[in-house]
Amino acid sequence: MATESPNSVQKIVVHLRATGGAPILKQSKFKVSGSDKFANVIDFLRRQLHSDSLFVYVNSAFSPNPDESVIDLYNNFGFDGKLVVNYACSMAWG
């Protein structure tokens, strides 16, 4: 039986929540590979919203570094089986 690293096979549920005047996505929950960088989530949101101006926050608290891996963010800040990512078109929190 071949073993793979847990980061390569684990999928993380990312719950995208609109904040402020940002448009609400038709589908708010997506599965993302744990090995992906958070920058992939940001790029995906930019494509969905057709906007270059985007501010993202984890748990309405902080804006993570785009180089962070999704699995690390989930392990440290995820709850109820998902990573909550708030997004806005203008700065929502300092």
From Swiss-Prot:
<dbReference type="GO" id="GO:0015031">
    <property type="term" value="P:protein transport"/>
</dbReference>
<keyword id="KW-0007">Acetylation</keyword>
<feature type="cross-link" description="Glycyl lysine isopeptide (Gly-Lys) (interchain with K-128 in ATG5)">
    <location>
        <position position="94"/>
    </location>
</feature>
<keyword id="KW-0833">Ubl conjugation pathway</keyword>
<keyword id="KW-0963">Cytoplasm</keyword>
<comment type="function">
    <text>Ubiquitin-like protein involved in cytoplasm to vacuole transport (Cvt) and autophagy vesicles formation. Conjugation with ATG5 through a ubiquitin-like conjugating system involving also ATG7 as an E1-like activating enzyme and ATG10 as an E2-like conjugating enzyme, is essential for its function. ATG12/ATG5 conjugate has an essential role in plant nutrient recycling.</text>
</comment>
<protein>
    <recommendedName>
        <fullName>Ubiquitin-like protein ATG12B</fullName>
    </recommendedName>
</protein>
<dbReference type="Pfam" id="PF04110">
    <property type="entry name" value="APG12"/>
</dbReference>
<keyword id="KW-0653">Protein transport</keyword>
<dbReference type="GO" id="GO:0000045">
    <property type="term" value="P:autophagosome assembly"/>
</dbReference>
<feature type="modified residue" description="N-acetylalanine">
    <location>
        <position position="2"/>
    </location>
</feature>
<keyword id="KW-0072">Autophagy</keyword>
<keyword id="KW-0813">Transport</keyword>
<dbReference type="GO" id="GO:0006914">
    <property type="term" value="P:autophagy"/>
</dbReference>
<dbReference type="InterPro" id="IPR007242">
    <property type="entry name" value="Atg12"/>
</dbReference>
<dbReference type="InterPro" id="IPR029071">
    <property type="entry name" value="Ubiquitin-like_domsf"/>
</dbReference>
<keyword id="KW-1017">Isopeptide bond</keyword>
<dbReference type="GO" id="GO:0005737">
    <property type="term" value="C:cytoplasm"/>
</dbReference>
<comment type="similarity">
    <text>Belongs to the ATG12 family.</text>
</comment>
